[in-house]
Amino acid sequence: MIEIDALTKQYGSHAVLDGIDLSVAAGEIAAIVGPSGAGKSTLARCINLLEQPTRGTIRVAGENLTELGRSDLRRARRAIGTVFQSAGLLSRLTAADNVALPLRYLDIPDQERHRRVHSLLDRVGMLHRASYYPSQLSGGQRQRIGLARGLVLEPKVLLADEPTSGLDPQTTASILELLAGLRDELNVAVVLITHEMDVVRSVADTVAQLDHGRIIESGPVAEVVRGSDSPLSRALLPTPPGRSLTAAGVWQLRYDRADVPETWLTSVSR
């Protein structure tokens, strides 16, 4: 659904992104991780074309967005929804008006605008808070509104830039559950930028590690975990699984943390 090929972003002679290749299918959540300064924020701005790449291509549903002129690009960018770290809601607008804002800019008819806003607020569990202002909402509630706004133009790709940063564990879990549900229901490709490995373990299908502007390791999460003893594998599983021989040819796999999903143990033990 989104294909990034040889993406490079330079400021002067300094390459902040250097030959990024990334493909995310419809219905897939791809996590991008990396230390501060690795280029994650620049990659996010290039994906939604707030920054123009120096070289390389970004294709959404087969259309090369990097070749488009200004007017065509404005249209094509509707295919990419964005959820920001702190929701980015306008304080003087209600929850419903924040969600409706992109539709107003496009002069979407009132009836269709009301239908989309009502449907999305209901889907994210915030219909009963439609008339509330951001200051009246909790951090998790604001992020739910941000998710609804990111989806209101019915995008093919959702860019979620640190959507759980600063949220408590319970709220984080609820936002990730909602994100996964929306991914399944709407069949969108999700690019999830995060520094939290718990988030990757909980919801991502694939993961790519960015360092000094390059992807140094990537793959399906389960394969990365059971692959080589790499920094990314160790970060995803801080304490490696312990194995003890209990009988000839029979091995027992144990893991000493309670928060590891049962499906992970099954995948790692194959």
Kindly label every feature range from the protein language model.
Residues 132-135, 152-153:
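Conserved signature/switch motifs of ABC ATPase nucleotide-binding domains
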Residues 48:
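Helix-to-loop junction immediately C-terminal to a conserved catalytic motif
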Residues 218-219, 227:
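ABC ATPase "signature
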Residues 158-161:
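Catalytic Walker B motif of ABC-type/P-loop ATPase nucleotide-binding domains
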Residues 33-35:
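The feature captures the beta-strand-to-loop junction immediately N-terminal to the Walker
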